[in-house]
Amino acid sequence: MKHYVAVDIGASSGRLILGKLVNEKLQLEEIHRFKNGFTYRDGHERWEIDQLMQEIFIGLEKVKQLGISECVLGIDTWGVDYVLIGASGEKLADPISYRDKRTLNAVQNLTSEYPREYIYKKTGIQFMELNTLYQLYVEERDLLERAEKILLIPDYIGYVLTGVKVAETTNSSTTQMLNLREQLFDKDLLSHLNIDVEKFAPLTDAGTYLGEVKEDWLKMYDIPNCDVVTVATHDTASAVVGTPAEGENWAFLSSGTWSLIGMELSAPINNEVAFKENYTNEWGAYGTYRFLKNIMGLWIVQEIARMDDYKHSFAEMAEEAGNYPYFKQIINVNDARFNNPENMVDEIRLYCRETGQTVPETIGELTNCVYGSLALYYALELEKMTEITGKKIEKLYIVGGGSNVAMLNQLTAKLAGIEVFAGPSEATAIGNLVVQMINQGEIESMRAGRKIIRNSFEIGEFSCGDVRFEEIKERFTKVLEFN
């Protein structure tokens, strides 16, 4: 029996999940979990990338302690951030987080020289200051000139493990530098940044064999012999693979630090309406496209908890939220002010004052405000997606950590007026494992993998119901008018 390990690292935590296929059912075991985050060093918010590598080795040593001497391994992480590699293969600096303030006004500055419509027509990717395109636009020229290669985070981890440099397509598409039609890094865009296209590794599809873990690591750590497979390395792409969807006319919501809501399509949509609504066409596994919108997500709730010194668990916060009427206060969760404020609680209260609303005081009221606002935003985006794609959405599959928040799932079902299915919470790791198993011939296809997922995990169901959607939507429109 083959053993598979998913290295799944999000913006706030990481984990190593051991998986195997037994009687057409996936069996999972969490082997190692660790925290992730950025710290302010050398003038920027930086990821502790060396510590992440150590955590991966710790996890693999735990796998070996289970008596497993050989395994297959795949890596997925958050998107857009990168590591600059020098001529000798060395890391030139710790990677800077997408939440760093260096890209403030970068979209405006770049698009004043290079029209938005032109960039969108080429790439089909939404405009966000965190995109790799804008990070490289403001990157230190000296570092860029010294860099032989630019590797996104999961590709860098794969490179450290195997010595092989690639640019996996699902994650590379999030950079806003891939040409949709040519399916290559866009030389014209890169020349505008004075970056040679050769600084990027060869594009590689999800499901491609990468290589063996280097002998040096096997000598340094007591870890299994691992064959590394390039999975859908963008965590959302893996989460969509791990969605237990069936049939047609469904949408997905990958709910975690970020909320990513969208549809899986066979072709991109980069027309004028999609451009106006700032929708993105990220590449998916096996020739698909993730037509989606980024929404701020549970980051806001995580920051409320941090400001409260973690006195309440997330479950307790949700329970407290249920004691108050929903939609008493509504915030625009995608307002840039909530990206990385000094104090999230103060920022929410200030927003409510500025928009003529009552001010949430307690942890329960604050959490209630955020969950209600998220559900409303989801419903509004589902409405827009139907208009843009011309496809009636009948089901929403919520996966990721946010799928455990029952009240958010129920609010979403009521506001959107469609049936909601929630779970599995570890969809990203599951999608990672499914791609590995397809590569190894244990699963036939992504469709077959989703059937296995449905048979392997409990999926929650939330029915739609009557709610004052139009009234709440009108109130939200008035709130936006204050901005």
Curated annotation (Swiss-Prot):
ATP binds at residues 11-15, 257, 302, 401. Pathway: Carbohydrate degradation; L-rhamnose degradation; glycerone phosphate from L-rhamnose: step 2/3. CDD domains: ASKHA_NBD_FGGY_RhaB-like. It catalyses: L-rhamnulose + ATP = L-rhamnulose 1-phosphate + ADP + H(+). Involved in the catabolism of L-rhamnose (6-deoxy-L-mannose). Catalyzes the transfer of the gamma-phosphate group from ATP to the 1-hydroxyl group of L-rhamnulose to yield L-rhamnulose 1-phosphate. Its EC number is 2.7.1.5. The keyword Nucleotide-binding applies. It is an enzyme of class 2 (transferase). Substrate binds at residues 79, 234-236, 294. Belongs to the rhamnulokinase family. Disulfide bonds join 352-369. Pfam families: FGGY_C (PF02782), FGGY_N (PF00370). The keyword Disulfide bond applies. Keywords: ATP-binding, Disulfide bond, Kinase, Nucleotide-binding, Rhamnose metabolism, Transferase. The gene is rhaB. The active site is at 235 (proton acceptor). Its cofactor is Mg(2+). NCBIfam families: rhamnulo_kin (TIGR02627). GO terms for biological process: rhamnose catabolic process. It comes from Listeria monocytogenes serovar 1/2a (strain ATCC BAA-679 / EGD-e). This is Rhamnulokinase. GO terms for molecular function: ATP binding; glycerol kinase activity; rhamnulokinase activity. It comes from the Bacteria. GO terms for cellular component: cytosol.
